[in-house]
Amino acid sequence: MKLVFCILSTLLGTFAYNPDHIAGTTPPYLVYLKSDYLPCTGVLIHPLWVVTSAHCNLPDLRVILGITNPADTTEHDVEVSDYEKMFRHPYFSVSSISYDLMLIKLRRGIKHSYYAKAVKLPQHTVPVNAMCSVSTWAYNLCDVTKEPDSLQTVNVSVISKAECHNAYKAFDIRENMICVGIVPGRRLPCKEVTAAPAVCNGVLYGILSYADGCVLRADVGIYASIFHYMPWIENIMKNN
């Protein structure tokens, strides 16, 4: 099936997992976290701070803003920064998707520009049925050994915890989680960069912890609810 999908995608000239996806420039808050292992997605929330999933605590991370195609080494208007320190949530465990959040303090502040701008943080929970933009990078399925080469965004809605539980019966969907996507997901080949953000009306409400499939094709994803972690986020930023 993967081979057929690869051939069709090559003929059509696209590797979009969802026909409703949006391709284009990188959202100014979106961060590509490059490592010697696997990349992750992050979000700029302050000139000195990036938030991502705790499972992205990977060796030799480099923080890259403004990049559309990580496989293109000639891309312009890209800003690269080293990090000073990582702060994983103290309750995070690799055996669970709970508390899957991490803050990264940059070595130097990112200058506000068209290509780099911090996203707003939430002051309340996100309502069910709210429309959100989920962005991350997709891999070319014909050669997943290379860097991902396609930035994509899909607009999907927040679903209820009951709907989410129906999609993920093996998981305990807690108050500090939100679920975004379509039930049920579509079982097509896909590979994307993990830790995609859910931004609703310009506000960051979620960071992806888990998805059985790919969020770029609108499969349901379980996200850390940023609002529920605001006390921890504010405390780390204030004291470091």
From Swiss-Prot:
Entry EC no(s): 3.4.21.4
GO molecular function: serine-type endopeptidase activity
Peptidase S1 domain mapped to chain residues: 17-238
EC top class, as a word: hydrolase
GO cellular component terms, A-Z: extracellular space; secretory granule
Homology family: Belongs to the peptidase S1 family.
Designated name of the protein: Putative inactive serine protease 58
Organism: Rattus norvegicus (Rat)
Lineage: Eukaryota, Metazoa, Chordata, Craniata, Vertebrata
